[in-house]
Amino acid sequence: MSERDAQGATDIEGIMNLLPHRYPLLLIDRVLDFQPHEHLASIKNVTINEPFFVGHFPQKPVMPGVLILESLAQACGMLAFKSVQDTLTDNDVLYLVGIDKARFKRPVQPGDQLRHDVSVRRVTRGIWIFEARGSVDGELAAECEIRCTVRTV
């Protein structure tokens, strides 16, 4: 499988080349669409085998809201890193600076495919500001505004 196809999709190998996250906190499975400095769409296939379902909640498994936000933040990271990947070094990391206006509209459960749609609102003084939405079967599950910055470590 190739890293990229004609629509800007990226497979898991390409994702792991850009994001430092690994199991159990790598929360993106595939990038579906990418427009540099504008938009990225990706998915997380949610399965009952996720480690967080052991305790959240055993009788009615629901993906924790904080992990939904983390998956959206990782999609924002992919958008930023894919947009500037020609200028990145191996020591560059994207740090989460803040999350505002977070709202949860429906639970995300095993068997769901969580779709991330993230867009750049603006980049100001090194801070990327994104609009982020997560949906399942076209129904809004969560939305927020995410701020990130690239730093060399």
UniProtKB/Swiss-Prot annotation:
NCBIfam families: fabZ (TIGR01750), PRK00006.1 (NF000582). Involved in unsaturated fatty acids biosynthesis. Catalyzes the dehydration of short chain beta-hydroxyacyl-ACPs and long chain saturated and unsaturated beta-hydroxyacyl-ACPs. It comes from the Bacteria. The keyword Cytoplasm applies. This is 3-hydroxyacyl-[acyl-carrier-protein] dehydratase FabZ. It comes from Halorhodospira halophila (strain DSM 244 / SL1) (Ectothiorhodospira halophila (strain DSM 244 / SL1)). Gene3D superfamilies: Hotdog Thioesterase. HAMAP family: FabZ.
